[in-house]
């Protein structure tokens, strides 16, 4: 899992400490140089339309590193069969979730891939968005959802 990040919010709106740590790991001390040489290119904008395989996006409803509006924009930019799961009341870490029976989202992603590769569960080109509630029945239950925002609109 990673950030969809079409708007580079991971460095512009998240905690400044996150950017400082990323700069340290990338070997940069100069923030202007880091923005120009690294951060400016860390986006999926302009690339999602080139994806050729079915795609699953999973995001926490209140993820500070990849806000819901960024995930919605990325979802709309995909032109392939697609699905997105929005995990109610969660942020970036998606493990040990009540929404998923105490399991990590990775377990469910593997099930999604198994269904895809076996031909048993194929997403549609139009796409499906599931709102995975804390007390719900998971991403394959009655969870179809239309986000109350469009790309570019703030969720909260």
Predicted regions located by residue number:
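Short beta-strand/loop motif that positions the catalytic acidic residue
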Residues: 51-52, 57-59, 63
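Catalytic active-site module of serine/aspartate enzymes centered on a nucleophile-bearing elbow/loop
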Residues: 98-156
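Short alpha-helix in the alpha/beta-hydrolase fold that links the catalytic acid
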Residues: 53, 67-76
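Catalytic histidine neighborhood in serine/cysteine hydrolases
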Residues: 75-94, 108
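Flexible loop/turn segments at secondary-structure boundaries
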Residues: 3-10, 64-66, 91-95, 135
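Active-site nucleophile elbow and catalytic-triad environment of alpha/beta-hydrolase enzymes
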Residues: 29-47, 53
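Hydrolase active-site cap/lid region
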Residues: 1-37
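Conserved adenylate-forming
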Residues: 11-14, 46-50
């Amino acid at each position: 899992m990673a950030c969809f990040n079409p708007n580079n919010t991971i460095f512009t709106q998240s905690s400044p400490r996150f950017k400082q740590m990323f700069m340290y790991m990338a070997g940069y001390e100069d923030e202007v140089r880091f923005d120009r040489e690294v951060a400016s290119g860390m986006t999926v904008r302009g690339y999602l339309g080139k994806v050729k395989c079915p795609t699953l996006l999973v995001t926490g409803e209140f993820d500070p590193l990849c806000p819901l509006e960024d995930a919605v924009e990325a979802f709309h930019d995909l032109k392939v069969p697609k699905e997105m799961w929005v995990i109610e009341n969660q942020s970036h870490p998606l493990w040990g979730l009540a929404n998923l029976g105490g399991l990590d989202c990775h377990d469910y992603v593997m099930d999604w891939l198994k269904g895809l590769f076996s031909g048993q569960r194929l997403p549609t080109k139009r796409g499906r968005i599931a709102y995975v509630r804390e007390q719900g029945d998971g991403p394959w239950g009655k969870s179809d959802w239309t986000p109350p925002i469009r790309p570019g609109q703030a969720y909260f």
